[in-house]
Amino acid sequence: MADLSFIEDAVAFPEKEEDEEEEEEEGVEWGYEEGVEWGLVFPDANGEYQSPINLNSREARYDPSLLDVRLSPNYVVCRDCEVTNDGHTIQVILKSKSVLSGGPLPQGQEFELYEVRFHWGRENQRGSEHTVNFKAFPMELHLIHWNSTLFGSIDEAVGKPHGIAIIALFVQIGKEHVGLKAVTEILQDIQYKGKSKTIPCFNPNTLLPDPLLRDYWVYEGSLTIPPCSEGVTWILFRYPLTISQMQIEEFRRLRTHVKGAELVEGCDGILGDNFRPTQPLSDRVIRAAFQ
């Protein structure tokens, strides 16, 4: 299965009728530079129901039906997880079968946890992709799941209705997050794009801030990275995780380029501010599982 550079491999460039077109698009690079218009290359980025969004908590609609079937992450400890710097983010690829069900997800369907991705700012005043009442957090984690009941792979699920579910976790600065130490301790070894390292153990359960899993918002949106395909159910937890200043600084030492690469003028090569601007809500409704 491709890693969520699956974005840069199979999924970002769906099958075309013309092989030449497919070959041409596979070489397309994308980034977070100011003024970059993803929609010129990735048409889905021009969709009406894009992510991320600003979440206005006062306008969120309480939906008690979200609690009829409790949101149930059945996560298991992952052995030998691969952590990769893909030049856009840090990915933790999970090989153990962890699944998510219940809550806003279609009844009787399971969503398999594929990977964890990180978005962070160069400064603590920004970094999260979503904002709450226009407040940004220093970091946001995405737990990306695909519908393993309806589809055979994440590549098949992307862009399909009920294909992808993403848990978003805001991150604030405070005490050290013990569950993320396995990742932050090896970031110096994967400082450059294309570097990977296997960690012996990673427990995704440590990323869930609320043991009751009741305080969350839900809306329908898209991937926040190209191809920006829609059909994504977003579950955003109300209460943030906490990591230390030292831990987030480890992310800020990462680079967007391969070691020894010549940088273009005006680019310092630092990996950070890797968040997409918020997109219009349009006519979407944000639901809340709490009052």
Curated annotation (Swiss-Prot):
It comes from the Eukaryota. Residues 28-290 form the Alpha-carbonic anhydrase domain. Residues 1-28 are annotated as: Disordered. InterPro entries: CA_dom (IPR001148), CA_dom_sf (IPR036398), Carbonic_anhydrase_a-class (IPR023561), Carbonic_anhydrase_a-class_CS (IPR018338), CARP_VIII (IPR041877). Zn(2+) binds at residues 119, 142. The active site is at 88 (proton donor/acceptor). Residues 16-28 have a biased composition (Acidic residues). The keyword Phosphoprotein applies. CDD domains: alpha_CARP_VIII. The record marks 117 as: Ancestral zinc ligand. The keyword Coiled coil does not apply. Pfam families: Carb_anhydrase (PF00194). Does not have a carbonic anhydrase catalytic activity. PANTHER family: CARBONIC ANHYDRASE, CARBONIC ANHYDRASE-RELATED PROTEIN. This is Carbonic anhydrase-related protein. The lineage of its organism: Eukaryota, Metazoa, Chordata, Craniata, Vertebrata. The gene is Ca8.
